[in-house]
């Protein structure tokens, strides 16, 4: 084929597309742009076919969304080259030339070359192909062949089979996206509640003969006019969002990625407020639209199913005067039942809980609830019957989480608790929450509920034991619903939430003792986590102070349960067994303190030494064998380590009190997720730096560090480190660390230059780059000793602890203890430090400035020798 100059055509097409986008920028009407882009490409393709002819008798057809008449700025152009018979060599050359020309034109075609028989065969085996062909549209070539394809596709279309296949396909797609419209970075096309769900509904309706548009589907009785209007509005919102994503990135991008969210918010003219980022406000709009689509999707799919697979109403069995069981779904007896008696809006969910044979609600009931939700007003909320019903829902032995989720989806819970409405769809770009506030709240309720189930008792034995012994444990669900209810308002959300739950308790007639408990839990829901992870639990005063704040055993048990459920509901990455151990240790120490256990330092020291001695005897060590080692240890050492650690150290060091070489011993932690590392060597200024550098290079995350210097000048340092995710063989890792870390300590200078910090996973790096944590450092003297407490907050990154350790060394600051708290990509660490530099205002200021630089990633790099 002779060379064809496509540049004039390409330039005309590009100019026309640019003009269409410019018009969209003036008047952002999604359908107008999609139609215009489709028209431009249609015209270009028809001109192209004149320059690069189709094989004789062939057809060029648009399929998929392009066939439907929609073309996004950077979408593939889906084409079918339909041949009347298998291609000859000449036909193949013609097709090849046409496809090459499509690429030269800059269209990025998604093309297939098939005969009519190929199309029928492919459609039989693949519902996606069948759907794409059902939306085919003639562009050029033989109209007769196109009509034959249309006739063949319509002839083989079985509405019932098509419905079942599309429903399964949708369920699989939803599962791929974790069955939630509330993803951090949703795909506006494919995620639940997105554009694809809207398309599936229309495909199902079209196949069943109920129309091609929302208006026609409403006319067929599957939708009300207001529902059709809501869906049309949501569809336009998602179409515009997808267009904006393409224009913002200059590529086919359907994911609302972290780094795109601020730019999108700017395009929409959304500005940050004093308490909310613009990106959070943008995403709240997205989640509200996706929730609407998800809910109406359920109603419509059920409606279509009931039309396609009708069953007589005689199958229904009355539950009571208001509800019946219709094909294992809760059905309202009278369609106007909720309007006549709004109390049924809550009782419907209670009936669902009390009848385990019900698998859901009928489409009629869902629609009636949806359209009656406005009946939940101030008068409804004041009604004692409704208040009692709401508490009954929380007190049921089953179905609590399912029904609270259903109440949220149907907008009943946000209407009943207006303060809850504010947090629906509210994302927190704080680097550790991966759910919206409302979804996190329901996840906390779910976690509390799991503690009550015998089949999950092995997951958290202490939690299961405590909740079984807690009277009226449903009060925990109340506390969970309110613990983050004031997020995004500004101010202390714990204090504001406590006021809200106090009002709820008064309105709902809670016993004063119970009301005081839930208020305490909401006000102090962060307390136990902070003490366990940031304070020295070996200090009796820390335990006494915490016990004084908690007050009694009921509060302690309830706070422990809420804390575990809260952390577990934040993100799968935030919880680990080490945090679980810290919380359990704090619980048991506080329980003993509340029970009158005398926890002064002298008693703790004596008991700990006695228990450590007993453990060393069990290991075959004589009492006199350990004395040389113990004589080098001061009181601080025995107070900072438990008996098991002291015995472990003693067994390995009693015979080498002053070794010539570094001693490194490692064992798996008792909770089985990490390693306990002991380092014993002659003290040196860069020892902590070298050790942290090694851990960082090996992707070992330090959770706890205790640094001690013996009377004769040897460093005895203890670390808890977590192995990389997915690392199964901890014993092999322990052996490797023992060998490699000892080698590093023998030659720390060479080790420091060999250090190469690990990298964060790409998605975590993107998120922390877009939503960074403002670095903070607070240095304050410790009231009970000559040490200082350094609290830091920053975005997590590889090498952060190593960078801080270098600052300590450079300023002559000695580390005594480190408590590392990592919350997703946010760190909140506490260091107990000492050093003469901290006693002088000028050098103290220089130290704090260097710490802030290190937190921000601006620390000076060390040059290789």
Swiss-Prot record:
Region feature Uridylyl-removing, mapped onto this chain: 319-675
Regions of compositional bias (Basic residues) in chain numbering: 751-767
Please name the SUPFAM superfamilies in this protein's record. Answer: ACT-like (SSF55021), HD-domain/PDEase-like (SSF109604), Nucleotidyltransferase (SSF81301), Nucleotidyltransferase substrate binding subunit/domain (SSF81593)
Q: Which cofactor does it need?
A: Mg(2+)
Q: What is its EC number?
A: 2.7.7.59, 3.1.4.-
Enumerate the Pfam families for this protein.
Answer: ACT (PF01842), GlnD_UR_UTase (PF08335), HD (PF01966), NTP_transf_2 (PF01909)
Q: Does the keyword Repeat apply?
A: yes
- Domain HD positions: 437-559
User: A GO molecular function for this record?
Assistant: [protein-PII] uridylyltransferase activity
Q: Where is the ACT domain?
A: 676-762, 789-865
UniProtKB keywords: Hydrolase, Magnesium, Multifunctional enzyme, Nucleotidyltransferase, Repeat, Transferase
Among the GO biological process terms of this entry, one is: regulation of nitrogen utilization
**How is this chain's activity regulated?**
Uridylyltransferase (UTase) activity is inhibited by glutamine, while glutamine activates uridylyl-removing (UR) activity.
Q: Where is this region: Disordered?
A: 747-767
The domain of life is Bacteria
**Region of interest called Uridylyltransferase, as start-end residue ranges on this chain:** 1-318
Function of the protein: Modifies, by uridylylation and deuridylylation, the PII regulatory proteins (GlnB and homologs), in response to the nitrogen status of the cell that GlnD senses through the glutamine level. Under low glutamine levels, catalyzes the conversion of the PII proteins and UTP to PII-UMP and PPi, while under higher glutamine levels, GlnD hydrolyzes PII-UMP to PII and UMP (deuridylylation). Thus, controls uridylylation state and activity of the PII proteins, and plays an important role in the regulation of nitrogen assimilation and metabolism.
What is the protein name for this chain? Bifunctional uridylyltransferase/uridylyl-removing enzyme
Organism per entry: Bordetella pertussis (strain Tohama I / ATCC BAA-589 / NCTC 13251)
């Amino acid at each position: 084929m002779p060379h064809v100059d496509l540049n004039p055509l390409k330039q005309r097409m590009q100019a026309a597309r640019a003009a269409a986008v410019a018009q969209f920028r003036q008047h952002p009407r999604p359908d107008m742009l999609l139609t215009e882009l489709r028209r431009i490409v249609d015209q270009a393709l028809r001109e192209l076919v004149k320059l690069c002819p189709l094989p004789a008798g062939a057809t060029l057809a648009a399929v998929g969304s392009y066939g439907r008449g929609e073309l996004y700025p950077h979408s593939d152009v889906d084409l079918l080259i339909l041949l009347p018979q298998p291609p000859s060599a000449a036909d193949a050359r013609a097709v090849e030339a046409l496809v090459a020309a499509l690429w030269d034109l800059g269209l990025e075609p998604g093309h297939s070359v098939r005969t009519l028989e190929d199309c029928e065969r492919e459609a039989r085996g693949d519902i996606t192909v069948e759907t794409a062909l059902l939306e085919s549209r003639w562009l050029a070539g033989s109209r007769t062949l196109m009509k034959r394809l249309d006739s063949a596709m319509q002839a083989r279309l079985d509405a019932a089979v098509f419905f079942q296949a599309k429903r399964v396909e949708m369920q699989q797609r939803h599962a791929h996206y974790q069955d939630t419209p509330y993803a951090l970075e949703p795909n506006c096309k494919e995620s639940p509640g997105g554009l694809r769900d809207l398309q599936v509904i229309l495909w199902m309706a079209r196949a069943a003969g109920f129309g091609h548009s929302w208006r026609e589907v409403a006319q067929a009785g599957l939708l009300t006019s207001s529902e059709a209007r809501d869906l049309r509005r949501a569809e336009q919102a998602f179409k515009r969002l997808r267009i904006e994503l393409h224009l913002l990135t200059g590529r086919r991008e359907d994911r609302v990625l972290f780094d795109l969210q601020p730019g999108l918010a700017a395009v929409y003219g959304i500005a940050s407020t004093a308490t909310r980022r613009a990106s959070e406000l943008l995403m709240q709009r997205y989640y509200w639209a996706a929730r609407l689509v998800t809910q109406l999707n359920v109603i419509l799919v059920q409606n279509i199913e009931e039309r396609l697979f009708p069953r007589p109403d005689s199958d229904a069995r009355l539950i009571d005067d208001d509800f019946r069981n219709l094909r294992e779904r809760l059905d309202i007896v009278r369609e106007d039942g909720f309007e006549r008696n709004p109390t049924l809006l809550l009782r419907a969910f209670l009936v669902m809980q009390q009848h385990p044979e019900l698998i859901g609600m009928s489409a009629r009931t869902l629609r009636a609830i949806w359209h009656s939700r406005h009946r939940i007003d101030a008068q409804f909320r004041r009604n004692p019957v409704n208040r009692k019903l709401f508490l009954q829902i929380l007190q049921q032995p089953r179905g609590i989480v399912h029904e609270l989720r259903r109440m949220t989806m149907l907008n009943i819970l946000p209407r009943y608790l207006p303060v809850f409405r504010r947090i629906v769809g509210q994302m927190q770009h704080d680097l550790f929450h991966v759910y919206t506030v409302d979804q996190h709240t329901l996840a906390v309720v779910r976690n509390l509920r799991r503690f009550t189930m015998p089949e999950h008792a092995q997951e958290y034995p202490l939690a299961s034991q405590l909740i079984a012994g807690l009277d009226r444990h449903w009060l925990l669900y109340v506390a969970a619903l309110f613990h983050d209810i004031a997020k995004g308002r500004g101010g202390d959300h714990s204090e504001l939430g406590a006021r809200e739950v106090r009002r709820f308790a008064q309105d709902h007639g809670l016993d004063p003792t119970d009301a005081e408990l839930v208020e305490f839990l909401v006000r102090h829901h962060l307390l136990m986590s902070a003490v366990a992870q940031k304070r020295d639990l070996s200090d009796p005063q820390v335990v006494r102070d915490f016990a004084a704040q908690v007050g009694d055993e009921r509060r302690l048990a309830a706070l422990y349960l809420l804390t575990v459920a809260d952390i577990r509901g934040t993100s799968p990455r935030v919880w680990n067994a080490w945090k679980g151990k810290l919380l359990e240790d704090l619980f048991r120490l506080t329980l003993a303190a509340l029970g009158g256990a005398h926890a002064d330092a002298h008693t703790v020291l004596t008991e700990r030494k006695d228990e450590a001695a007993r453990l060393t005897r069990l290991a075959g060590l004589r009492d006199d064998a350990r004395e040389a080692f113990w004589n080098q240890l001061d009181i601080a050492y025995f107070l900072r380590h438990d008996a098991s650690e002291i015995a472990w150290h003693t067994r390995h060091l009693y015979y080498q009190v002053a070794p010539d070489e570094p001693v490194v011993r490692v064992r798996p932690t008792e909770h089985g997720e990490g390693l306990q590392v002991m380092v014993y060597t002659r003290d040196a200024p860069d020892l902590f730096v070298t050790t942290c550098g090694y851990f960082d290079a090996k992707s070992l995350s330090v959770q706890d560090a205790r640094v001690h210097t013996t009377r004769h000048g040897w460093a005895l340092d203890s670390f808890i480190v977590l192995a990389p995710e997915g690392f199964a063989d901890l014993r092999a890792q322990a052996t490797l660390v023992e060998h490699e870390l000892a080698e590093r300590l023998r030659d720390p200078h060479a080790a420091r230059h060999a250090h190469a910090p690990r990298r964060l996973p790409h998605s975590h790096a993107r998120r922390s780059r877009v939503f960074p944590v403002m670095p903070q450092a607070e240095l304050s003297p410790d009231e009970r000793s000559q040490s200082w407490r350094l609290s830091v907050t920053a975005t997590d990154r590889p090498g952060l602890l190593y960078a801080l350790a270098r600052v300590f060394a450079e300023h002559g600051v000695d580390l005594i203890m480190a408590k590392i708290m990592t919350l997703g990509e946010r760190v909140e660490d506490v260091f107990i430090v000492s050093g003469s530099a901290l006693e002088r205002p000028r050098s103290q200021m220089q130290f704090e400035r260097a710490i802030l630089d290190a937190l921000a990633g601006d620390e000076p790099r060390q040059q290789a020798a």
